Amino acid sequence: MDVHIDNQVLSGLGTPLLVHLFVPDTVMAELCPNRVPNCEGAWCQTLFSDRTGLTRVCRVFAARGMLPGRPSHRGTFTSVPVYCDEGLPELYNPFHVAALRFYDEGGLVGELQIYYLSLFEGAKRALTDGHLIREASGVQESAAAMQPIPIDPGPPGGAGIEHMPVAAAQVEHPKTYDLKQILLEITQEENRGEQRLGHAGSPALCLGLRLRAGAETKAAAETSVSKHHPALENPSNIRGSAGGEGGGGRAGTGGTVGVGSGALSRVPVSFSKTRRAIRESRALVRGIAHIFSPHALYVVTYPELSAQGRLHRMTAVTHASPATDLAEVSILGAPEREFRFLISVALRISASFREKLAMQAWTAQQEIPVVIPTSYSRIYKNSDLIREAFFTVQTRVSWESCWVKATISNAPKTPDACLWIDSHPLYEEGASAWGKVIDSRPPGGLVGAASQLVALGTDGHCVHLATTSDGQAFLVLPGGFVIKGQLALTPEERGYILARHGIRREQ
């Protein structure tokens, strides 16, 4: 769980309020069914439910590991920054959504969305009756960690999830030491003002005495070195490191030359206060139901950390609102707003195809040479195929769609830079393939990339949507027939897409 420490100390976020998570592999498999991701980072942002907009994207660390107490549970440890309601430091909106986009060496793994309600309530319950998985020493794990971890019951009718009380038994174990523990003990004694370096016979005492003996021996050796000039430091010393090594007195004062001992002052070892606090803190875990899926997530809390203790004081704004205001609250505010935005753009692209096809007397030219000569055209008026193709393009939407990637791309602004293609099975016979990139820099646009698109035209079970960075759109039908359209976005829509993917720039 060192990744939680790194996020708490090194993330550099504007808010110290973090909810630490463990995401099981069963949840990650929903995001990326093709491989077991080994993520080292995630991009997080909050989608507001009560207003349009979202927070800036921030990067947090992530690491794959095993959840203590559940040897069969492997997954990804990470943290989620959460934000209070505007002007109300102790209130949060339970219907805000935290979006985490995971990445590994293979690229994007997927996006996980979590309601603030799950994060805050899971953290509060973990602080009150969470399962102990690490003692306060911060070095040894509790033997009670091998017992089942309590998980909140899922929604009615969902799969049953076990619930266990807090493990109160404390089991004695032989104490073990490592270098981190020794340095930690020395630091604690320094903070308490003690002069000894550990109790009798402890590794901290042995290490401290040997380090002190080495320093004193070196100091004695340096002192015994004869000096050939008062203005010089001891041989092999860095100039100025030993202080005033013998500067003569001021003129007319009759000052004498001072000779220093050459011994360097000891600097106490110091760690980040936050890092030390979280290492010394207990670790409590609590399972929560993930509202967007039937799976469970786990919230890990560190009670001795002051920033974590603040989570226990947070209250949902719905608890402080009158019943009349609650009637106007939309639980699906953020997800619904995003879905409507994606659908609206897809409908406009489909409408441009329909308009172009009507201007061509409902005929489409074969631009991809499959089997039939390219001069062949086909009439699609009142065609079941074109009706199903339009319906598929209008209803299958994603933030990984080709037109989204074309919008956020940094490719040169030329008509023939790159093509991004979505492949959709007709009649809902399978999953879609999103945002495949095809290089079309040779002149000719879609025709110039025809050799790379032959496989798309020969697939009689799929319809393909292609877009370019300059706003061109193409609908590729079975047989290589192509309908041309347009991707038109307002500056506000383009800015929202860029902000959703962590890009802030003038358009």
UniProtKB/Swiss-Prot annotation:
Subunit structure comment from the entry: Interacts (via C-terminus) with capsid vertex component 2/CVC2.
Disulfide bond entries: none
General function of this protein: Capsid vertex-specific component that plays a role during viral DNA encapsidation, assuring correct genome cleavage and presumably stabilizing capsids that contain full-length viral genomes.
InterPro entries assigned: UL17-like (IPR007640)
One CC-aspect GO term: host cell nucleus
UniProt biased composition (Gly residues): 241-257
Chain intervals for the UniProt region annotation (Disordered): 219-257
Species per Swiss-Prot/TrEMBL record: Epstein-Barr virus (strain B95-8) (HHV-4)
HAMAP family: HSV_CVC1 (MF_04017)
Record keywords, A-Z: Capsid protein, Host nucleus, Late protein, Viral genome packaging, Viral release from host cell, Virion
Listed name of the protein: Capsid vertex component 1
Species lineage: Viruses, Duplodnaviria, Heunggongvirae, Peploviricota, Herviviricetes
GO biological process: chromosome organization
Family affiliation: Belongs to the herpesviridae CVC1 protein family.
Subcellular location: Virion; Host nucleus
Pfam families per UniProt: Herpes_UL17 (PF04559)
